Curated annotation (Swiss-Prot):
Cleaved signal peptide residues: none
Stored PANTHER family: RIBOSOMAL PROTEIN S15, BACTERIAL AND ORGANELLAR (PTHR23321), SMALL RIBOSOMAL SUBUNIT PROTEIN US15M (PTHR23321:SF26)
Organismal lineage: Bacteria, Pseudomonadati, Pseudomonadota, Alphaproteobacteria, Hyphomicrobiales
GO cellular component: cytosolic small ribosomal subunit
Protein name per its UniProtKB record: Small ribosomal subunit protein uS15
Protein's GO biological process: translation
Species assigned in the record: Methylorubrum populi (strain ATCC BAA-705 / NCIMB 13946 / BJ001)
Keywords, alphabetical: Ribonucleoprotein, Ribosomal protein, RNA-binding, rRNA-binding
Amino acid sequence: MSITAERKTALIKEYAKGNKDTGSPEVQIAILTERITNLTAHFKTHGKDNHSRRGLLKLVSQRRSLLDYLKRKEEARYRTLIERLGIRR
């Protein structure tokens, strides 16, 4: 259900603006998207896991807030990010 440290590092390298960038909205949204994808796959086999479903809804809400922030600040970055991640919006 969780992502490995190696995968997280790869996501940070892929979406970061600089060497030490781990907190930009793009990086945070990419990590949240990976976690959401993993949880969605988990629910295909564990449909009654309501405790984890609540966590999924929290992650989706957090990602939505970050996406709204990015859209408000710089729409061009927002558009390229949702295109790269394959998020429908």
